[in-house]
């Protein structure tokens, strides 16, 4: 598509088209004709004869154009020398290179000037792809940079150049860069173009346009094919690029220096430039070796296990790490631990008063000097290659936050089971609110991330999940399916084995979410946590009571519950208008009960508390406990439409339980929560509960 020149525009700069030529009688006339045929008329065409030795054939063709072109003849000095000669003699504000064997489409200059006219920065370099043709000008195929990189990346200075996507004749360059940066290096026979583009692109803005505007001829007479030292020159050029680039430039191009180097190595692996490939590969490996990881271990008693945990870090295949041990006011004799820490200079030991693991980890973060932070509880263990594999994974995928799968072991260190939590990855928010499978010793993140996101110290249980939720709300989560840590199960002292501690953690997480202005918008996802907490507290705390309840006749339980509900919520003076309506409502209730039980079966696989306990038992227990325990916190409840709705509109614990269970089921579906709320409102209105 041709972009028509805006006749009202005052942007109409002179463009100099420079054609360097050496023995170019075969193709030069076509090149000059394509330059003179440009629809943009404010141009000058400069032909520089670089000392051709073809009995004057090249010069004769050039002179035949008379004053239509500006013709110069000089001694042979190479392509770079001829281009420099043309630049020194050009009058235009923009430079456009045309090889003597290539061709411009008629709208090449006009199209690029129109693009510049729309850009605020008139010093931007415009470029695009090209069409490859054979010696007779017959079409071969298109070279499209946008098939290799996204448009955003094609506009990042240097990146398209370092992926071999820049064709010099597609460029439109402000002449100022030749005066302010450099000219072509005349000592380079075949890489003088990329050498100069590298220098200019480091300071200039570039803009990719997808329209094909040039034809590049592929034939056996091209100069670069005749230079025996071409590969050696290219190896040296690409190696120099790698050595000159700063870390900031690499990060700008690919997000991290490691990612840039690995992708550059991958690009170079398919070229003859194997020395440059080896350099890029070695530089990438060195990035990993140089990446320091700070491993933070909070300690409270259990010194023997703590020493085992530290040893699992000292045995890592990745050697650049520091171990930061935070003694959180242990009451046991810690002399052996202190003695052990002094044996290795990579271990730093700090003592503080007991304020909980969140406070201890935060102190560790403040004392860390690594690029990355990994957490390890004092009774857990790392696999020997944990840091190496997770670090490489994060660098390769440009993650700043990740976790892995893990194994559970008993107090003796014996294997119990594998937990495939690493499959939980990507954009996990907001579902992470209702299901957070991340184990502390599997986590690794950047120091910068944790400096900005500390653990909530006012929470003693569930503080880790609170932080993971907060971080995941703004960042992708990297997940590794391979098991790289061992989590020790310590009976009742382990959170998920202790109903009271587990429930308190869930309540803490819920409170944290509802008291955060942003997270509170996703309040329906806390329903799963609340119902699980109540179930744990009111059912798991008494195995005998549970067994007794399981043996009760379900229909009798429901009948008693209905009677209790009737006594509690219905006005004694109110009676139904007729028996038929009563039967209708009763049938509707039974139908809805069957529907809910059907929904319950569909989610049993994802909710272990449903598979373990009868549905009516959960309702009976929840109704007696929920409001008292879980709605005590009045802070910012106006941000939670769900809790406000319950407290204002409802008077019955039974109905609260019913809503909780329906919303728990609905929350497993992406669009189910609001629809269920509407359904419940209609149900209550029909039953005169407002």
Curated annotation (Swiss-Prot):
InterPro entries: Glyco_trans_2-like (IPR001173), Nucleotide-diphossugar_trans (IPR029044). It holds the Pfam family Glycos_transf_2. It comes from the Bacteria. The keyword Transmembrane helix does not apply. Belongs to the glycosyltransferase 2 family. PANTHER family: GLYCOSYLTRANSFERASE (PTHR22916), UDP-GLCNAC:BETAGAL BETA-1,3-N-ACETYLGLUCOSAMINYLTRANSFERASE-LIKE PROTEIN 1 (PTHR22916:SF3). This is Uncharacterized glycosyltransferase RBE_0706. It comes from Rickettsia bellii (strain RML369-C).
């Amino acid at each position: 598509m041709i972009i028509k020149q805006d006749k009202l525009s005052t942007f109409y700069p002179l463009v100099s088209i420079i054609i360097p030529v050496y023995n170019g009688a075969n193709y030069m006339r076509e090149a000059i004709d394509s330059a003179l045929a440009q629809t943009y008329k404010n141009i000058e065409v400069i032909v520089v004869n670089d000392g051709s030795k073809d009995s004057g054939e090249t010069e004769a063709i050039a002179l035949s154009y008379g004053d239509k072109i500006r013709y110069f003849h000089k001694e042979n000095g190479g392509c770079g020398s001829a281009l420099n000669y043309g630049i020194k003699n050009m009058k235009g504000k923009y430079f456009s290179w045309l090889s003597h064997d290539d061709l411009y489409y008629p709208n090449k200059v006009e199209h690029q000037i129109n693009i510049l006219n729309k850009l605020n920065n008139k010093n931007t370099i415009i470029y695009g792809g090209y069409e490859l043709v054979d010696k007779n000008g017959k079409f071969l195929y298109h070279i499209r940079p946008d098939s290799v990189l996204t448009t955003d990346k094609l506009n990042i200075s240097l990146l398209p150049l370092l992926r071999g996507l820049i064709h010099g004749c597609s460029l439109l360059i402000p002449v100022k860069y030749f005066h302010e940066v450099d000219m072509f290096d005349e000592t380079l026979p075949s890489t003088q173009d990329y050498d100069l583009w590298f220098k200019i692109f480091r300071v200039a803005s570039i803009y990719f346009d997808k329209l094909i505007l040039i034809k590049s001829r592929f034939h056996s007479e091209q100069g670069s094919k005749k230079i025996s030292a071409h590969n050696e020159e290219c190896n040296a050029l690409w190696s120099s690029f790698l050595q000159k680039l700063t870390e900031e430039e690499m990060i700008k191009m690919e997000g991290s220096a490691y990612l840039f180097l690995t992708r550059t190595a991958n690009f170079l692996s398919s070229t003859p430039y194997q020395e440059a490939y080896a350099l890029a590969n070695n530089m990438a490996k060195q990035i990993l070796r140089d990446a320091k990881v700070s491993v933070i271990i909070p300690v409270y008693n259990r010194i023997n296990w703590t020493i085992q945990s530290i040893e699992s870090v000292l045995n890592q295949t990745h050697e650049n790490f520091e171990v930061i041990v935070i003694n959180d006011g242990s009451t046991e004799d810690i002399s052996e631990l202190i003695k052990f820490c002094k044996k290795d200079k990579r271990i730093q030991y700090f003592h503080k008063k007991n304020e909980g693991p969140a406070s201890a980890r935060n102190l560790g973060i403040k004392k860390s000097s690594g690029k990355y932070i990994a957490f390890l509880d004092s009774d857990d263990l790392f696999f020997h290659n944990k840091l190496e594999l997770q670090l490489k994974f994060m660098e390769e995928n440009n993650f700043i936050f990740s976790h892995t799968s893990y194994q559970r072991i008993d107090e003796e260190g014996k294997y119990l089971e594998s937990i495939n939590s690493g499959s939980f990855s990507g954009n996990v928010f907001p579902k992470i609110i209702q299901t957070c499978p991340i184990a502390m010793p599997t986590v690794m993140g950047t120091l910068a991330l944790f400096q900005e996101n500390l653990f909530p110290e006012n929470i003693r249980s569930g503080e880790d999940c609170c932080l993971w939720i907060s971080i995941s709300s703004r960042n992708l989560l990297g997940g590794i399916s391979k098991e790289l840590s061992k989590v020790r199960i310590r009976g009742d002292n382990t959170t998920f084995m202790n109903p009271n501690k587990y429930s308190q953690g869930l309540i803490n997480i819920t409170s944290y979410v509802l008291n955060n202005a942003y997270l509170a918008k996703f309040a329906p996802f806390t329903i799963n946590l609340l119902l699980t907490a109540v179930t744990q507290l009111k059912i798991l705390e008494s195995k005998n009571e549970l067994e007794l309840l399981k043996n009760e006749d379900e229909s009798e339980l429901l009948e008693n519950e209905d009677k209790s509900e009737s006594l509690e919520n219905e006005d004694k003076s109110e009676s139904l208008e007729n028996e038929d309506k009563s039967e209708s409502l009763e049938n509707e209730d039974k139908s809805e009960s069957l529907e809910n039980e059907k929904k319950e079966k569909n989610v049993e696989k994802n909710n272990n508390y449903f598979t373990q306990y009868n549905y009516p038992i959960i309702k009976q227990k929840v109704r007696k406990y929920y409001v008292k325990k879980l709605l005590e916190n009045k802070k910012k409840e106006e941000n939670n439409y769900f809790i406000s709705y319950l407290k204002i509109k409802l008077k019955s614990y039974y109905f609260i339980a019913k809503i909780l269970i329906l919303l728990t089921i609905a929350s497993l579906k992406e669009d189910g929560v609001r629809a269920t709320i509407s359904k419940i409102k209609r149900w209550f209105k029909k039953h005169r509960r407002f």
